[in-house]
Amino acid sequence: MTSSKPKKSSRVRKTSKNSKKNNKIIMPTLAKTPPSFKNKVVDKKALKNLVSWAYKTHGTAVTAAMADNLKDLGFKYATQAAVSISVEDLKVPEAKQDLIGQAEAQITSTEECYRLGEITEVERHTKVIDTWTETNERLVDAVKNNFNQNDPLNSVWMMANSGARGNMSQVRQLVGMRGLMANPQGEIIDLPIRTNFREGLTVTEYVISSYGARKGLVDTALRTADSGYLTRRLVDVAQDVIVREEDCGTERSIVIEAEDGKFGSRLIGRLSAEDVLDSEDNLIIPKNTAIDPSLSKTIETSLISTVNIRSPLTCEANRSVCRKCYGWALAHNHLVDLGEAVGIIAAQSIGEPGTQLTMRTFHTGGVSTAESGVVRSKIKGKVEFSSKAKIRGYRTPHGVEAKQAEVDFLLKIIPSGNNSNKAQKIEVTSGSLLFVDDGQEIDSDITVAQITSGAVKKSVEKATKDVICDLAGQVRYDKVLQPKEVTDRQGNITLKAQRLGRLWVLAGDVYNLPPNAKPVISTEKNVEQGTVLAEASQYSEFGGEVRLRESVGDSREVQIVTTSMLLSNFNLIEESTHSGEIFHLESNDGTIYRLNTSPGSKISSGEVIADLADERFRTKTGGLVKYAPGLSVKKARSSKNGFEVSQGGTLLWIPQETHEINKDISLLMTEDMAWIEAGTEVVKDIFSQTSGIVTVTQKNDILREITVRNGSFHECEDEEVLNRFTEEGQLVNPGEKIIDGVDNNEILFVQKLETSKSKGLLLRTVEEFNIPDEAELPELTHVKQEKGPSLGLKAIQRLSYKDGELIKSVEGVELLKTHLSLESFDATPQMTIDVETIKDKSNDSINRLNLVILESILVRRDTISDSSHGSTHTELQVKNNQQVKAGDVIATTQILCKEKGIVQLPDLVENEPIRRLIVEREEDKIKINITGKALVKVGDRVVDGDSISEGEKATSCGEIEEVSSKCVTLRLGRPYMVSPDSVLHVKDGDLVLRGDGLALLVFERQKTGDIVQGLPRIEELLEARRPRDSSTLCKRSGVVQIKEGNDDESVSLSVIERDDSINEYQLLIGQNIMVSDGQQVKGGELLTDGPINPHELLDCLFTDIKDQKPLMDAARESISKLQRRMVNEVQNVYKSQGVAIDDKHIEVIVRQMTSKVRIEDAGDTTLLPGELIELRQVEDTNQAMSITGGAPAEFTPVLLGITKASLNTDSFISAASFQETTRVLTEAAIEGKSDWLRGLKENVIIGRLIPAGTGFSGFVEELASEAGPHPDILAEESGGYRRAQNLRPDYTVDMPQSPTVSSTAILDDPSDEDLETTRNRHGIDPSSSNFAAFARPNAENQFSEDQLPDPAALEGLQEEGLLSDE
C-alpha cells in the first residue's frame, strides 16, 4: 500500500528559505577564517568576546565544547592555587598621605579665603567638595599604579582588574579612601572619610559612612519592586507585537549619526534602508542588507557620518513588525524569524536591567562642574585678544574672578623677546571663561582659559544656604552691598543685597536684656566691671500681704495674699484611719462636713471642698427612685456628681434588695415568687435583709440575680383590673381604688405579676424624702474686696440618681448629697486658691480652715555671667508680712557689666524696647605700631595682609578706630562675603550673638546634579509624565524678540512668525531664557530652561510642520522626531549607569506609545471626534474619502504613556487583565466590542495556542496555495488567524495507519528541501533514522509491546525512506 504524498504542508515557512539564503552568504566565509592566536591576558571582557566570537563563527556545538574546556581549565588552576584575600593583600599606596596632605593644604587656603571674606560660604563648600572629589580620583590612580608596578599578582587587584569580583570603586574604599558621603537629605557632607576599611574608620566617620549604607539597602528593596512593576507594564503594552510579515515594503527609515566618527554597535543587526555609497560613489552596502560588525567597520573607515536604516519605528506592517524592519534577533544574530514575539523580548530587555539602575541621585549642593577644556599657555609671552572680542566679568563657582566671552573669537599668545617660538592660538567659544587680560604678560604653563563646548546655557535652579555668625558683635554693611527692601506678593518686606559685597561683624560683648529691663546708662560711656547696665523690676498686680518663702532651685518665691477667708464658725477635726488622714469640719450647731481636700493643697474655683455628712437621705437597701411632681433638677448631669436640684420637693423611694449571684442553680434555697422573712437564707451563705417577695432571674441553669421586693401580693383574675397596671409598675395615690378588699391610705407602688401558678398585683410601700429648695449654709461664707478677686462658698444639693432609675444593691445608698463649693470672682486663671489651717486666736486647741488667693512672684536669683548674659543681682524691696498696694515694686534685678569697656546702645526704633546692648572691651581691639606714614583712615575696614602703613601689614581683619603717628588701633571683626540677591537677616548696626543667622545666600546651581535619574526617570519617560515647571517651547518657527520690562525682573519674550504675526510667551518667575534676541527658532525648540513636556513638544512640532506640509506627513514627521528623542532619552539613562540595551527594543515600545492619533473633526468619515485610533487606520479611511470625494478626518497625533497605551489596546481582554478591569469590561460590553485575539495575552487568557512561535499561522495567500487536502484550515479567516474551531496546533501528515497509532509530524513533508538541509545540518542519515526522530510522542503514539503498528503501515514508511529495514 503506498502512502499518498501530501503536497507541501501549511506549516512551511516560506520565508525561512530566504533567511537561510541571506545567512548562507556569510556563514561559510566566516567558518573558513583561519584560527588566530591571541597573546594577551584574558579577563572577563575578553572571555565574553571570545565566547561570542566562537558562537558567531562556529555555531553552538563548537562554542559549547569550548566553554566546557574553558571551565575545565579554570577548575584545574583553581585546585592548584586559590585566589583568596587576606588582610595582607590590602596594600595602601604610599602616595596617599601626600595626596591627602595636598588636599588639606588646598582646603586650608580655601578656608583662609573664606575667613578673609573673599569667597562666600557656597563657594567655599563647592571648592572643598571639588578638592576632595579630585583627590579621590587621583588616589584611585595611585592605587592602580601601586598594584600594577609593585604587586601585579595581588589577589585583590587580580579580582578587581579581571572583572571576576568587585570593581575599582570598591577597591578604592578598601585601600584608598572611602571619600565623600551624602547626608539623609542627599546633600554631600563636606567632611570626607579620609581613612579606608584597611586602616579603619574613626567613630565620626563610621556614623557618616552608615548614612550611605542604610540608604543603599532601602534603595535596593524599593528598586526590585519598582522594576518588576515597570516590566509588567512594558509587557502589557508590547505583548501583541509579533513579527508577522516578511517585508512591509516601506520607503521610510531613520537616520543613525556617527558619534566621533564611530557607530559602535548601533548599526549591527539592522538592515540598510538605501544603498550606502562611499565618498567616491562606490557601493559599499546594497539596500536591505543586514549590517554585521565587519560591514559597520567598513562604513566607519569610509568616513560615512550618517546611515539610513530600517527600524520598527517606521515599519508599515499592520499591527506588527516585519522581519526587514526589525533586523537581527539578537539571540542568534540572524534575521528574526516569523512569529517571534519581539514585543515581549523588548519589554524584558528594558525592564530587567531596571534593578541595576539607581533610584535617586544625590543633591550635590551645586557640586563639581568638571573643569572642561582647560587650556594652559605653552609659551611665555603677551596675551592678545582679537578685535571682535566681547567679554564681561564673571565669578566662577569657586569664587575666582574671571571673564566670560560673549562671542567666539581668537586669542593669541605672542612670544616675548626674540623668541623663535610660534604664537599660540586659542579658539575661544562664546561662554568660555578667561583667566587673563588683554595685553597681559604671562609665563608658560599658566591657566589661560576654560573653553566650553556645546550648549553654553546649562539649565540652572535657585538654591539657598544660610550664613551663620561666628562671633558676637555689631553688624556693619559694606557700601557696595546697596541693600534694598523688596516686597513680595504677600506683602512681606525682605532686605536684599544688590551687589557682591561684605557684611562685617565687629567684635564686642553683647548682652541679652531680660524682657522688662531698661538700660540705665548712656551710649559711648566707659564702664568698669560690676557697673549696672540695665534694671528690671517686678510688680504686684493686686497688692496684699507679703509672705516670703524659702528659695526653691534658682529662684525665690514671693507670695502676696490678695484675698483670704477664714471659716471661723467651723472647727477643723482630724481623724486618722488606716488609709490616711481624714478631715472634718464641724459647725457650731453640730453639722459635720467631710473635707474633700487637705490643708496645704491648691484648688481652683468651682471645686467642691466639702460634703455634708447627712444620714437623713440614706436608705437601707437598693431600690427605685421616683421624683414626685414639683421636684425638678437641672437637665445636664454635672459630671459624675449627680443632678443639681433646681427646685425642692418630694423624692419617692421604693426599696428593693438585689443580690447578684452568678452561680449554679442548684444552690438556690428558695422558690420564685415565694414570700420570705428578713434573715432567710436565699442562696447558700447569702441572707435576705428585708421581708418580701422573691424573684429569681436565671439563664442556662446559671442563677443570675435574686430580687426581694417588699409589699404584699394579691391574687386577681379580673383582666380589666390587671390591665390597668404594668409589670414596670406605677404609683397610686391614697384613696384610689386598686382591688376589692384593699384600702389604701398611703401612696403605693403597684406592679402586675404573672407567674405560671397565679396572676395578681404586688402592692409595695413607698418611702418619702423631703428636699428643701435651698441647702442650709453656715454663716460667713463670702469675702468681697474693692480691688482684686473675691471668694465665696456656695451650697449645692445634688441628687445621685435620675427619675425612674433602679439601683441594684444590697447596701443602702445616699440619695441626696449637699456639697460646699468654692467660688472666686475676678480671679485670673493662673491664680490658685490655697487651703491652710490656722490656730484659733482665743483657743490654741481649736484649728480653723483658712482659704487664701495668692499672687506668686518668682524673683530671680543672682546669676554669674555667661556668654550672652551679664551677671545679675536681685534685691527684694519688701519685707515679710508687709502690706503692699497694687503696682508696687516687689524686686529689682540689675544686669552688671562683666568687663570694663565702652557701652554702645543700638539705634532706637519707635515703640520697640532695647533687647541687646554691646560693650566694646580692650580685648576686642589691637594696636599696631607703625613707623612710616599711615595709609588708612578711621572707619576703613581692612583684612589680614592689607597694608596699613608703608612698612606694616594688618595682622587681623577689622575696622580702623584711631590713627596716630605711632600706631593704629584696629577693632577686630569678621567679614562675610554675600552674593547679589541674598536675603539679609540683619540690618546695619544690629547686634548679633554667635550662631545667629546673618543672611541667606541665593545661588544658582546646575540642575544636572540632581535631575531625576535611574528608574524614576525611565518611568517618567515611558509613562510620558508632564514634568513640573516645564520649559516653554516655541510653537511655530520664527525670529525671537526679547524686550526688557520696566523693572529689572520682568522680561517679555515673543516670536515673530512666518506670517508676521507675533506670538508672546508668558514666562514664569525664575525661568532662564535659552535664546538670544534676533535668533531664528523652529517649532518645538526650547525658549526657556527646564524639563521638556513631551506632549507639548509633539504638539508644537505638529503645529509647526502642518503649516508647510500635508496633515499626514506632518503627523508622521512630528511623531518621528518625538520618537527619536524618546529613544535617546531612555538610552541616556541606561548608558549613564553602564547598561547596554539595543535601540530596537526601546523603539518597539516607543512605537506602541506613539501609534495613535486623536480625531478632531470627523469630516464625512464614520469616526467620532475625540476617538483615539491608529494612524494607519485614519490614513486608509482618508484615502477612501479622497476617492469618493468626501471630507477627510482631521486629527492630531498623541503620545500615550505605557499604562494608557495598554488600556487603549484593541483587545479588551488584554486591557481588562491589566488594570481597571470593571471599567474596561463595562465599556466593552456597552460598545458591543469583539476581541480578535491577535495578541499573546488574550489567547493565553482564554486558553488557546498563542499566535507566536509554532502557533504562528503565516499568510493567508500562502496557506491558500498550499492547503492541499485540508482547505478547511481557511474556512473562516479573520486577520490572518484561524478561528478557534479550525485551529490545529500542527499540520498532520496523512498516513495509512492502524487506529491505535497516530503521529504528529514536527517537520513537514519529507520532500521538503528544508528537511534536507535540516538533516544535513544535524548530520542525520535518513536511511538510519528512526520514525521517532520525526514524530512528536503523544499519548497515543507511545508504542507498547502488544501494540506494534500494522506491517502495511511500516512498509509504507520504509518506502518513504523514513524507516530503515530494522
UniProtKB/Swiss-Prot annotation:
Pfam families: RNA_pol_Rpb1_3, RNA_pol_Rpb1_4, RNA_pol_Rpb1_5. It catalyses: RNA(n) + a ribonucleoside 5'-triphosphate = RNA(n+1) + diphosphate. Binds 1 Zn(2+) ion per subunit. Zn(2+) binds at C248, C315, C322, C325. It is an enzyme of class 2 (transferase). It comes from the Bacteria. GO terms for biological process: DNA-templated transcription. Residues 1-23 have a biased composition (Basic residues). Residues 1-25, 1290-1366 are annotated as: Disordered. GO terms for molecular function: DNA binding; DNA-directed RNA polymerase activity; zinc ion binding. Residues 1354-1366 have a biased composition (Low complexity). Residues 1295-1305 have a biased composition (Polar residues). GO terms for cellular component: DNA-directed RNA polymerase complex. Its cofactor is Zn(2+). Belongs to the RNA polymerase beta' chain family. RpoC2 subfamily. NCBIfam families: PRK02597.1, rpoC2_cyan. DNA-dependent RNA polymerase catalyzes the transcription of DNA into RNA using the four ribonucleoside triphosphates as substrates. In cyanobacteria the RNAP catalytic core is composed of 2 alpha, 1 beta, 1 beta', 1 gamma and 1 omega subunit. When a sigma factor is associated with the core the holoenzyme is formed, which can initiate transcription. This is DNA-directed RNA polymerase subunit beta'. It comes from Prochlorococcus marinus (strain MIT 9515). The lineage of its organism: Bacteria, Bacillati, Cyanobacteriota, Cyanophyceae, Synechococcales.
